A protein has these predicted regions:
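Short, charge-rich amphipathic alpha-helical segments embedded
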Residues: 156-163
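Structural alpha-helical scaffold elements that stabilize or flank donor/cofactor-binding regions
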Residues: 5, 19-20
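Short, flexible, solvent-exposed loop/turn segments with mixed acidic/basic and small polar residues
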Residues: 14-19, 112
Length: 163
């Protein structure tokens, strides 16, 4: 087995779910591996049910994992740390559930993941904090126009993605 081209599929051998990876993404960071080996791995991933196979650099992988996975966990944990959280029942519905869902984490594991990917995660945190600060400042200044522009900017980004 050539360790430069072999990558694990997580806990697939521990799980009994037939469609565990159905339509999930499989990310390959070739790191100089031969193209034919990369294609074999990509085809294997597709055959076992992965919906998307993404070939990328380690740097882009780390940036995108910071944004798509780690940042939402930071956001969710920060959100539920509000003193309002214990009293949310009767007031909350889908928005609370959507934002807070990923706060239910293994804190030791995620601490390790955050620290291993700290630079890209810090960059994403800085961007999020900047965006939140802009919205906060517009609310504080009672600047309806700026606030609406910021909210519309987020809406346009999400809509352009077709989501």
């Amino acid at each position: 087995r050539d360790s430069s081209t072999s990558r694990g599929l997580g806990d697939v051998y521990k799980r009994q779910e037939a469609d565990l990876y159905k339509n999930a993404s499989y990310i390959i960071t070739p790191c100089g591996a031969p193209e034919d080996k990369i294609e074999i791995l990509a085809n294997l991933a597709r055959k076992i049910g992965f919906g998307t196979v993404k070939i990328t650099t380690p740097e882009e992988h780390d940036r995108m994992i910071a944004f798509t996975s780690q940042l939402p966990h930071v956001l969710a944990c920060s959100y539920v740390m509000s003193p309002c959280c214990p009293n949310h029942k009767g007031f909350s519905a889908g928005s609370y559930r959507d934002v807070s869902r990923v706060a239910n984490i293994n804190s030791q594991l995620w601490s390790e993941l955050f620290l291993e990917n700290r630079e890209p995660l810090i960059t994403e945190l800085d961007i999020l904090i900047d965006n939140i600060t802009k919205i906060k400042d517009a609310i504080k200044a009672e600047d309806r126009e700026t606030l609406a522009e910021l909210l519309e900017q987020g809406h346009k980004v999400k809509t352009a993605l077709g989501e």
